Amino acid sequence: LLMKGFTINELSIGQEATWTKTITEADVLLFGAVSGDVNPAHFNEEYAKNTFFKGRIAHGMISAGLISAVLGVHMPGPGTIYLSQTLNFLAPVRIGDTITATGKVVEMIPEKNRVKIETICTNQDGTVVTKGEAMVMPPK
């Protein structure tokens, strides 16, 4: 499968792409194993019910990973170099939540081949769980 991303000349302000995924128990277990983040807030219900969130939550970086899928696969897509990302975690993500990551082009810097993309993750209720901005270099 040969995939080609959008060049800066093929992008426009306001252009959007999304990726949606339901977060599973396996996602949390695998992320914990890969990242080493085995905080009991993610794995132990007894522990987690006494925390601020009153129950287990998924790792915030799982939602950030969905942003990476938007940028690397959908827009700009294959060939994109992910340069930077700001993130604000605004609400918890729980196992079973369906998260939609959206990237929206907000600024283009053609002379540097850079694109600033607003990044937002929402859950199935429309609650914004993660928000930030990415700077990428789209493929040539």
Task: Label every model-predicted segment.
Residues T18-T22, N88, K104, M135-M137:
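Generic structural detector for well-ordered beta-strands
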